[in-house]
Amino acid sequence: MKTLLLTLVVVTTVCLDLGYTLKCNKLVPLFYKTCPAGKNLCYKMYMVATPKVPVKRGCIDVCPKSSLLVKYVCCNTDRCN
């Protein structure tokens, strides 16, 4: 009975994700990082003058406001940035 219970616990732990963690792209989208607790948004920062070339990507807790020179795009799904 103990073996059955232990097996059930192990299978449940393996099958269920015990804490969802967001994955965000780094500057080079081939690589990504797992965000720490509390950082539940991915972001991409780029210069307004060159919108096709991101300057920075990563995890963040609150999406910053864009300015006349810098634009931020935020999202909340895996590798969406």
UniProtKB/Swiss-Prot annotation:
It is found in: Secreted; Target cell membrane. Gene3D superfamilies: CD59. Pfam families: Toxin_cobra-type. Disulfide bonds join C24-C42, C35-C59, C63-C74, C75-C80. GO terms for molecular function: toxin activity. Expressed by the venom gland. Keywords: Cardiotoxin, Cytolysis, Disulfide bond, Membrane, Secreted, Signal, Target cell membrane, Target membrane, Toxin. Monomer in solution; Homodimer and oligomer in the presence of negatively charged lipids forming a pore with a size ranging between 20 and 30 Angstroms. Belongs to the three-finger toxin family. Short-chain subfamily. Type IA cytotoxin sub-subfamily. This is Cytotoxin 2b. It comes from Naja sputatrix.
